[in-house]
């Protein structure tokens, strides 16, 4: 869902991405450069395929995902040495590949999204089904180094949903109804406060629209577009809050 709420790409971003795909020989398989890329490599991927490399240097997944999303499912199943290669691009948005014949610098400005199970069997902390020891669980999470964790801004823990819950009711709908009931109880003052916290304007013409209970992709994208426009006005095209310097953080 992440790519569906991200704003369209600027002309400069499209041109940069087209160059990357052209070098990789994949331009024909991606005719629409206005849509941000979403790359989800298999956990068996090598360092060269992820970062880029080869005798004749070719862009890796980090460059093919530039200006879009790189999704690593089951992060703990990836080779630890491969994951560690993400430090540089996550920090700088670029990747430098060194060869005997010289060095090559490629764009690698992507959003990293990952998913992991709570343990090797996937049932922790349900001790009626999980057979992993505390040592096993710690070892499972220990495959992700502290430097990589430091580069991840948001971490969300999800509880297992039973099969009966999945087929018996729409969990999202129930949550939305609950928010609306709470909104009715808080009254007008509560609604004004919720509007301020959630984001007031979502339409291009500046019309006021409450977004609580309406978090579909199209509505969320309008909010993101509005926020990105503010960032572009402050920092310039192609730079967002994640690339702010210390001085810029203090200023804004």
Mark where each language-model region is.
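Conserved Walker B
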Residues: 68, 74-78
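Walker A/P-loop
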Residues: 1-26
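Basic, amphipathic alpha-helical bundle interface domains used for macromolecular binding and assembly
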Residues: 57, 80-252
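Conserved alpha-helical scaffold flanking the Walker A/P-loop in AAA+ ATPase domains
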Residues: 31-32, 37, 48-70
């Amino acid at each position: 869902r992440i790519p569906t709420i991200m704003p369209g790409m600027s002309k400069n971003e499209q041109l940069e991405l087209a160059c990357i795909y052209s070098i990789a020989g994949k331009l024909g398989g991606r005719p629409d450069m206005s849509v941000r890329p979403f790359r989800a490599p298999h956990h068996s991927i090598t360092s060269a395929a992820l970062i880029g490399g080869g005798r004749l240097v070719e862009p890796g997944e980090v460059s093919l995902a530039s200006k879009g999303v790189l999704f690593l499912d089951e992060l703990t199943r990836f080779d630890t040495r491969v994951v560690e290669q993400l430090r540089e691009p996550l920090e700088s948005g670029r990747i430098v590949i060194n060869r005997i014949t010289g060095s090559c610098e490629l764009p690698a400005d992507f959003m990293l999204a990952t998913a992991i199970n709570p343990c090797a069997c996937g049932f922790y902390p349900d001790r009626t089904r999980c057979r992993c020891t505390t040592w096993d669980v710690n070892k499972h999470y220990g495959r992700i180094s502290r430097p990589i964790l430091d580069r991840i801004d948001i971490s969300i823990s999800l509880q297992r949903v039973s099969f009966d819950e999945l087929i018996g009711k729409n969990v999202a709908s129930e949550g939305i109804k609950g928010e609306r009931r709470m909104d009715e109880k808080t009254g007008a003052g509560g609604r004004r406060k919720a509007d301020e916290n959630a984001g007031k304007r979502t339409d291009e013409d500046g019309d006021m629209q409450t977004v609580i209970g309406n978090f579909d992709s199209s509505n969320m994208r309008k909010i993101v577009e509005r926020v990105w426009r503010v960032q572009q006005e402050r920092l310039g095209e192609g730079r967002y809050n994640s690339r702010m310097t210390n001085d810029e953080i203090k200023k804004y």
